[in-house]
């Protein structure tokens, strides 16, 4: 699901809200989450999951074109850990794996 699809679904379910207001709310929510993670804080949404930063240490990579070693600096990457309720809901009734 894309951001625009999410906005459409919410606007369809909450018809008393203007489409523009739903779009603003979704964009504001995502911007605030991005700012919070960028400042190093953790985000916890009970029943859904938590977002945090994980540190990737510096390492030696390889240039795929030349094969030469390249020093890659350490960095932080966003990480999502689903909550129990979300895991249970996703797995409820799933007996076969999702086919790609």
From Swiss-Prot:
Region (Disordered): 53-100
Keywords: DNA recombination, DNA-binding, Transcription, Transcription regulation, Translation regulation
Keyword match Chloroplast: no
GO cellular component labels: chromosome; cytosol
GO terms for MF: DNA binding; structural constituent of chromatin
Protein name: Integration host factor subunit beta
Record family assignment: Belongs to the bacterial histone-like protein family.
Subunit and partners: Heterodimer of an alpha and a beta chain.
Function of the molecule: This protein is one of the two subunits of integration host factor, a specific DNA-binding protein that functions in genetic recombination as well as in transcriptional and translational control.
Pfam families tied to this protein: Bac_DNA_binding
PANTHER family hit by this protein: DNA-BINDING PROTEIN HU, INTEGRATION HOST FACTOR SUBUNIT BETA
Biased composition (Basic and acidic residues): 82-91
Gene Ontology BP terms: DNA recombination; regulation of DNA-templated transcription; regulation of translation
Keyword Transcription: yes
InterPro entries noted in UniProt: Hist_DNA-bd, Histone-like_DNA-bd_CS, IHF-like_DNA-bd_dom_sf, IHF_beta
